[in-house]
């Protein structure tokens, strides 16, 4: 077991409960999809896993004994946690290679980051681009790439961190179906080959059923399903989506999050 969440709860200012007593385990090489309606708590869960939000109650333990509320453990955890965003968060005027190299900055001091990175880091970045099928685009500016290619650069950047955990927050929401399948296929293959625990939030049930080893359904901050993709049926989907309220936790301004300290 790599990560354990025990009775995790998050309450935002005003008393809005984004997560309620969530207990989950995640294992190396496991490809998990979090399904839920907008405002169900999916993104809050991912932010907790990355240490960006401090839970109101409960614990997050990695490697069986280290809790990420310890600042030193949290720093090490973030260093080895790759994050893939819905809006890829790339630097448009830079090349694909330059963007992927930013994934290596966590391994260098702030002062060192102002200077060219070592050749070893460039080799790692090029290998990551090759693994997502974009080695030939290494020197292309990312604003000249398609949306699907840009998201694959985002995967390569996260992979350059040499992560043990990969988090993806609605990574294909803005892509067409063909690009969505390609992006998730690359991500799943890489994580399984490298033994990386992958946790991805999605809206698309068809993609979850096609690629997930495990699906976790969340509704109003509570876990309502946890099982294999083959086990999820219409009744489970009704439990996940049928009772969602029109509350969008992801729209709460970031300055109102219960943010964790560095």
Swiss-Prot record:
EC number(s) from the headed UniProt entry: 7.3.2.2
An annotated Gene Ontology molecular function: ATP binding
Entry-linked Pfam families: ABC_tran (PF00005)
SMART domains per UniProt: AAA
Group of enzyme by EC: translocase
Catalytic function, reaction form: phosphonate(out) + ATP + H2O = phosphonate(in) + ADP + phosphate + H(+)
Localization per record: Cell inner membrane
Keyword annotations: ATP-binding, Cell inner membrane, Cell membrane, Membrane, Nucleotide-binding, Phosphonate transport, Plasmid, Translocase, Transport
Subunit structure: The complex is composed of two ATP-binding proteins (PhnC), two transmembrane proteins (PhnE) and a solute-binding protein (PhnD).
Record's protein name: Phosphonates import ATP-binding protein PhnC 3
Source species of the chain: Nostoc sp. (strain PCC 7120 / SAG 25.82 / UTEX 2576)
